[in-house]
UniProtKB/Swiss-Prot annotation:
<keyword id="KW-0874">Quinone</keyword>
<keyword id="KW-0830">Ubiquinone</keyword>
<dbReference type="GO" id="GO:0016655">
    <property type="term" value="F:oxidoreductase activity, acting on NAD(P)H, quinone or similar compound as acceptor"/>
</dbReference>
<dbReference type="GO" id="GO:0009060">
    <property type="term" value="P:aerobic respiration"/>
</dbReference>
<dbReference type="GO" id="GO:0003954">
    <property type="term" value="F:NADH dehydrogenase activity"/>
</dbReference>
<feature type="transmembrane region" description="Helical">
    <location>
        <begin position="317"/>
        <end position="337"/>
    </location>
</feature>
<protein>
    <recommendedName>
        <fullName>NADH-quinone oxidoreductase subunit H</fullName>
        <ecNumber>7.1.1.-</ecNumber>
    </recommendedName>
</protein>
<feature type="transmembrane region" description="Helical">
    <location>
        <begin position="203"/>
        <end position="223"/>
    </location>
</feature>
<dbReference type="GO" id="GO:0005886">
    <property type="term" value="C:plasma membrane"/>
</dbReference>
<comment type="subunit">
    <text>NDH-1 is composed of 14 different subunits. Subunits NuoA, H, J, K, L, M, N constitute the membrane sector of the complex.</text>
</comment>
<dbReference type="GO" id="GO:0048038">
    <property type="term" value="F:quinone binding"/>
</dbReference>
<dbReference type="InterPro" id="IPR001694">
    <property type="entry name" value="NADH_UbQ_OxRdtase_su1/FPO"/>
</dbReference>
<keyword id="KW-1003">Cell membrane</keyword>
<dbReference type="InterPro" id="IPR018086">
    <property type="entry name" value="NADH_UbQ_OxRdtase_su1_CS"/>
</dbReference>
<feature type="transmembrane region" description="Helical">
    <location>
        <begin position="1"/>
        <end position="21"/>
    </location>
</feature>
<dbReference type="Pfam" id="PF00146">
    <property type="entry name" value="NADHdh"/>
</dbReference>
<keyword id="KW-1278">Translocase</keyword>
Length: 348
């Protein structure tokens, strides 16, 4: 039995095991099981990717990186997590207490919800919605609320400035990000992530939509606050931005959400442009993970290669370059589809 068979058989097994129970009980049980799997995936990825990024940055800067705990420093992230668990939970004087407390939880919830529509392999989609891409974009946009709450609730000018930067940056770059995805949707004729992957059986959309992929990558880098667009927490200017006053596990939730979002935007890029789980010989889930980690490596490589840019240059580049290019890509895609229909089907 393959991993795909196990994944797709979970729902059938639970329905048989809970035969006679109300439908909502079965649905709830399946949802809880999928949630546990997604949370385990997020936590394991965060531990591994933090270590990987530190090693990659060390290699690019001719350093060694973590090498003390475990073989080649593999347990360094575990030690950091244990350290954060033991940190004192501090709430600043004058802070808006409940806003300050709730913000880290609110940013982690949408970061988890994004994985509901990610096709991890053939038949391995937790919730294969017919509006999957729209769901992903809608849920991802809510993270700005939590970051703004964190900056406001801390009663710190640097935190508030960082959160305001975040809102300006993420709201601006959501537009070309969405427009870059529209070209793929036009080609696939569906918003369902599994159908978009299936439509790339003959050719990956990165070959048909290279400009859209570049726009998506740049906009996604800004959306997840990765360098060179990490102005939300520019250390030299505003310390840690909206995370300045957070300690312990509250800070860890922000950090965990950052890597969860990095994996999710990489997974969406693989789904939309790189053929998703499709590939020869290897299992579908393994192909998907390989492509996702290649995308993550590219994000990390960009972070440690390019310098941080100014906020005015960041926003100007979005409105004057990315947005017109994304609109032009939609126009060219639409014309190309019509020409293809005319040549192959004989109709306009």
């Amino acid at each position: 039995m393959t991993v795909e068979d196990i994944f797709t058989g979970i729902a059938a097994y639970l329905r048989g095991f809970l035969a006679g129970a109300p439908p909502w009980v079965v649905t709830l049980a399946i949802g809880v099981l999928y949630l546990i799997g997604v949370l385990a995936f997020i936590f394991l990825n965060a531990l591994y990717l933090i270590y990987l990024e530190r090693k990659i940055s060390a290699y690019m800067q001719q350093r060694i990186g973590p090498n003390r705990l475990g073989p080649h420093g593999l347990l360094q992230s575990v030690a950091d997590a244990v350290k954060l668990l033991g940190k004192e939970d501090i709430i600043p004087r004058g802070a808006d207490r409940w806003v300050f407390i709730i913000a880290p939880v609110l940013i982690f919830i949408p970061a988890t919800m994004l994985y509901a529509v990610i096709p991890f392999g053939k038949g391995m989609v937790p919730a294969d919605l017919n509006i999957g891409v729209f769901y992903f974009l809608a849920v991802a946009s809510t993270t700005t609320i939590a970051i703004l709450m964190g900056g406001w609730g801390a009663n710190n000018k640097y935190a508030l400035l960082g959160s305001m930067r975040c809102v300006a940056q993420m709201v601006s770059y959501e537009i070309p990000l969405t427009f870059s995805i529209l070209g793929v949707i036009m080609l696939a004729g569906s918003l369902q992530t599994s159908q978009i992957v299936a439509a790339q059986g003959k050719i990956w959309y990165i070959l048909l939509q290279p400009l859209a992929f570049i726009i998506y990558f740049i906009a996604a880098t800004a959306e997840v606050n990765r360098a060179p667009f990490d102005l939300v927490e520019g250390e030299q200017e505003i310390i840690a931005g909206p995370y300045t006053e957070y300690t312990g596990m509250r800070y860890a939730l922000f950090y965990l959400s950052e890597y969860a979002n990095l994996v999710s935007v990489s997974a969406l890029a693989v789904t939309l442009f790189l053929g998703g789980w499709q590939g020869p010989w290897l299992p579908s889930w393994l192909w998907f993970l390989i492509k996702v980690y290649i995308m993550i490596f590219i994000f990390m490589w960009v972070r440690w290669t390019f310098p941080r840019i100014r906020i005015d240059h960041l926003l100007s580049f979005n409105w004057k370059v990315l947005l017109p290019l994304s609109l032009a890509n939609i126009l060219v895609t639409g014309v190309g589809i019509k020409i293809y229909q005319l040549l192959t089907l004989g109709r306009w």
